[in-house]
From Swiss-Prot:
UniProt protein name: Thymidylate synthase
Molecular function GO labels: thymidylate synthase activity
Keyword Transmembrane recorded: no
Keywords attached to this entry: Cytoplasm, Methyltransferase, Nucleotide biosynthesis, Transferase
Oligomeric form and interacting partners: Homodimer.
Pathway(s) the chain acts in: Pyrimidine metabolism; dTTP biosynthesis
Length: 283
């Protein structure tokens, strides 16, 4: 929790004002932010200086694991984050690759489970990683990437958190996740929950101990209309101890994650928090 608040303070103290052409707003921006999550100690990085929610973040992660390309599928498992991108983005609505209502195109999990090969067919990146790690293999290329510039025009949104690199040392699994851009007051809580949970799940289904998750953010920013709430409310609150994440121990394989697992198989315990803060969201 301290590292999150330190990053927020760093944005205020060291950030440079940058005009964002997409939103028409200014952002205080810093380049390169490194966060570390101790999955081995089960220190779940759910923000405590405001009431935060984890279920939609984990549901979205499940959708990525399953390779979903439709907002309706995400809604069915408890995640509404793709509704607007799939249905209210005019550029995507006009795109000839859009298949209809709720279609997201070739984004995130589609790339992770069915990356197109130039000679035909596709690569299931996640399946390869799970198979290797289950056999105790780390070829120094256990990389799950959603970032495919050759198919950006075939999807509604470029990935923000785009690459997950797994490393097996002895019987302990580690993860390094890369993110190109992050709205710190709103988006980071969502993202860090996913990084933590992804490592915990992958360790569980491949039979290894979870280690450390390293989260690398390139462009970390706070929008001008979020600044006052961050300075005058959230940063003046004392954080509570991190809660714990409890995952159903019956989840034992990638096939389990693809089929019967739901958000009800995840529980957060010991979560103390301050009141919610309604930060403005920039579309």
């Amino acid at each position: 929790m301290k590292q999150y608040l330190d990053l927020c303070q760093r944005l205020i103290d060291e950030g440079t004002w940058v005009e964002n052409s997409r939103t028409g707003k200014r952002c205080l921006t810093v380049i390169n932010a490194d966060l570390v999550y101790h999955v081995d100690k089960n220190e779940f990085p759910l923000i405590t200086t405001r009431k935060s929610f984890y279920k939609a973040a984990i549901a979205e992660l499940l959708g990525y694991i399953r390779g979903y390309d439709n907002a309706a599928d995400f809604r069915a498992i408890g995640c509404n984050t793709w509704n607007a991108n799939a249905n209210d983005n005019q550029a995507w609505l006009d795109n000839p690759h859009r298949k209809g209502i709720d279609d997201m195109g070739r984004v995130y999990g589609v790339q992770g489970r069915a990356w197109s090969k130039p000679d035909g067919g596709c690569i299931d990146q996640l399946r390869k990683i799970v198979d290797d790690l289950s056999k105790g293999i780390d070829d120094r290329g256990e990389i799950l990437s959603f970032y495919n510039p050759g198919e950006f025009h075939m999807g509604c949104l470029r990935p923000c958190m785009h690459t997950h690199n797994f490393s097996l040392v002895g019987d302990t699994l580690h993860l390094t996740s890369f993110q190109r851009s992050c709205d710190v007051p709103l988006g980071l809580n969502f993202n860090q929950v996913q990084v933590f949970t992804l490592l915990a799940l992958m360790a569980q289904i491949t039979g290894h101990k979870p280690g450390t998750a390293f989260h690398k953010i390139v462009n970390a920013h706070i929008y001008e209309d979020q600044l006052e709430l961050m300075q005058e409310v959230q940063l003046k609150r004392e954080p509570f101890t991190s809660p714990k994440l409890v995952i159903n121990p019956n989840i034992k394989s990638l096939e389990d994650l693809e089929t019967w697992v739901s958000i009800d198989d995840f529980e957060v315990t010991g979560y103390e928090h301050h009141e919610a803060i309604s930060y403005p969201f920039s579309v």
